[in-house]
């Protein structure tokens, strides 16, 4: 039988069988321990059931995409959820999430929640930066369901993951979409104005002819598994200019006659995005030096 992993808890995986409402609890075969392949939420798998009615994952089919921390496979799009206030926006963290989406070939849509707390005009430079990078933006108030109809339309025929830091309203958004309190939603700490890590586990849910993954809200994101060569291809607004640089393999850093740096000077690429790229590039280069 074949199906999709919709949940994983304590070494057990719950598989929704194709063309059926049946969900079967399985464990992964021991052979997976000897490989680098570990079952992930969203994996399309083949399973067997023994004479004792115990399920086992026999095969994991090739993944179309992978998202790490949290681990989710075969996602087609990411709703990158942030707020301008409560908690305050962290631009570097937003850029890291977008970077990870690009690395995994995920369509990223930026969702700003809690818009009732702010005046959008006060954040027009941030908004301009994101739009200039080519990302769609949706402005939300999930509690009052403002623009949640747009989110529901996006879900259809997609496998969608909610990404973003703790406390921005990812679980609230999911609750509104599916119409019940599926995940425990924590209150914001008054002292820190940051969310509690209250989402218990990752789970894939069938909603509106699509699949949703609700993921734990992390306040930091590690991208150290990437290399500087990966970084070059994960800033989409660079792509129109890369072939115009004087030097093949230009890192758009200290090289002369760099088309990307010229585009920044002329306002075609937002300076904050370029500064984030340089900061991240230098972190990668320093990490490589330490390895040697």
UniProtKB/Swiss-Prot annotation:
It comes from Clostridium botulinum (strain Langeland / NCTC 10281 / Type F). Monomer. Associates with 30S ribosomal subunit, binds 16S rRNA. GO terms for biological process: ribosomal small subunit biogenesis. Its cofactor is Zn(2+). Its EC number is 3.6.1.-. Gene3D superfamilies: Nucleic acid-binding proteins (2.40.50.140), P-loop containing nucleotide triphosphate hydrolases (3.40.50.300), Probable gtpase engc, domain 3 (1.10.40.50). InterPro entries: G_CP_dom (IPR030378), NA-bd_OB-fold (IPR012340), P-loop_NTPase (IPR027417), Ribosome_biogen_GTPase_RsgA (IPR004881), RsgA_GTPase_dom (IPR010914), RsgA_N (IPR031944). It comes from the Bacteria. Zn(2+) binds at residues 245, 250, 252, 258. Residues 64-221 form the CP-type G domain. Its main location: cytoplasm. It is found in: Cytoplasm. Pfam families: RsgA_GTPase (PF03193), RsgA_N (PF16745). Belongs to the TRAFAC class YlqF/YawG GTPase family. RsgA subfamily. PANTHER family: SMALL RIBOSOMAL SUBUNIT BIOGENESIS GTPASE RSGA, SMALL RIBOSOMAL SUBUNIT BIOGENESIS GTPASE RSGA 1, MITOCHONDRIAL-RELATED. This is Small ribosomal subunit biogenesis GTPase RsgA. Binds 1 zinc ion per subunit.
């Amino acid at each position: 039988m074949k199906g999709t992993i919709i949940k994983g808890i304590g070494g057990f995986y719950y598989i929704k069988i194709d063309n059926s409402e049946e969900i079967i609890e399985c464990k992964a075969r021991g052979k997976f321990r000897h490989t680098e392949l570990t079952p992930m939420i969203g994996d399309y798998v083949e399973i067997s059931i023994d004479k004792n009615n115990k399920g086992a994952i026999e095969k994991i089919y090739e993944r179309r995409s992978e998202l790490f921390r949290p681990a989710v496979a075969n996602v087609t799009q990411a709703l990158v959820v942030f707020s301008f206030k409560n908690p305050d926006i962290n631009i570097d963290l937003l850029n890291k999430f977008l970077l990870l989406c690009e690395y995994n070939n995920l369509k990223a849509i930026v969702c700003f929640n809690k818009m009732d707390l702010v005046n959008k005009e006060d954040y027009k430079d941030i908004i301009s930066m994101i739009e200039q990078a080519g990302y769609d933006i949706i402005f939300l108030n999930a509690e009052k369901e403002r623009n949640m109809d747009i989110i529901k339309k996006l879900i259809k025929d997609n496998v969608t993951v909610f990404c973003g830091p703790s406390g921005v309203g990812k679980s609230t958004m999911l609750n509104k979409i599916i119409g019940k309190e599926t995940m425990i939603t924590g209150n914001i700490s008054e002292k820190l104005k940051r969310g509690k890590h209250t989402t218990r586990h990752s789970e894939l849910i069938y909603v509106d002819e699509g699949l949703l993954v609700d993921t734990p809200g992390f306040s930091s994101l590690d991208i150290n598994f990437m290399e500087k060569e990966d970084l070059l291809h994960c800033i989409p607004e660079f792509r129109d200019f890369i072939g115009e640089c004087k030097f093949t393999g230009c890192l758009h850093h200290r090289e002369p006659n760099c088309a990307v740096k010229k585009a920044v000077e002329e306002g075609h690429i937002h300076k904050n995005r370029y500064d984030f790229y340089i900061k991240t590039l230098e972190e990668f280069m320093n990490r490589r030096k330490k390895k040697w």
